[in-house]
């Protein structure tokens, strides 16, 4: 029973992810910031979809943070610094099928506070 519930939950997230990705894409001047969260950590990438390259990436394991709101704020500050060093101050936020709530919302707000326009 539990395995079926988890499969359904993950498959619904992947459906949401595909609907979102059909509508957004990243350019060199305005990359797509994709977030992935696990139970232990958060992973973030700034992706330029035209050439299919990752401009910069950061994750909670390297920074030694947990997958909570305060950890998301630290991660946002790190990725905003990397983007600013490349001269990028605008991006498209890809929530990757997750609800815009909790850690995902805290990450997006912290990005805005650190000077990245979403």
From Swiss-Prot:
CDD domains reported for this sequence: Ribosomal_L18_L5e
Gene3D superfamilies linked: 3.30.420.100
Amino-acid biosynthesis recorded as keyword: no
Keyword Ribosomal protein attached: yes
Keywords for this protein: Ribonucleoprotein, Ribosomal protein, RNA-binding, rRNA-binding
Record's GO cellular component terms: cytosolic large ribosomal subunit
GO molecular function: 5S rRNA binding; structural constituent of ribosome
Gene Ontology BP, a term: translation
Domain of life: Bacteria
Physiological role: This is one of the proteins that bind and probably mediate the attachment of the 5S RNA into the large ribosomal subunit, where it forms part of the central protuberance.
Family: Belongs to the universal ribosomal protein uL18 family.
NCBIfam families hit by this protein: L18_bact (TIGR00060)
Subunit structure: Part of the 50S ribosomal subunit; part of the 5S rRNA/L5/L18/L25 subcomplex. Contacts the 5S and 23S rRNAs.
Name of this chain's protein: Large ribosomal subunit protein uL18
Species this protein is from: Campylobacter fetus subsp. fetus (strain 82-40)
Taxonomic lineage of the native organism: Bacteria, Pseudomonadati, Campylobacterota, Epsilonproteobacteria, Campylobacterales
């Amino acid at each position: 029973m539990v395995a079926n519930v988890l499969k359904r939950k993950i498959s619904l997230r992947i459906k949401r992810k595909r609907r979102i990705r059909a509508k957004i894409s990243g350019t060199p001047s305005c990359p797509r910031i994709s977030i992935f969260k696990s139970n232990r950590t958060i992973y973030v990438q700034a992706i330029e979809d035209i050439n299919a390259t990752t401009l910069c990436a950061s994750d909670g394991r390297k920074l030694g943070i947990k997958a909570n709101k305060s950890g998301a704020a630290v991660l946002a500050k790190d990725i905003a610094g990397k983007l600013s060093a490349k001269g990028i101050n605008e991006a498209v936020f890809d929530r990757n099928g997750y609800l815009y709530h909790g850690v995902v919302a805290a990450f997006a707000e912290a990005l805005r506070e650190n000077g990245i326009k979403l």
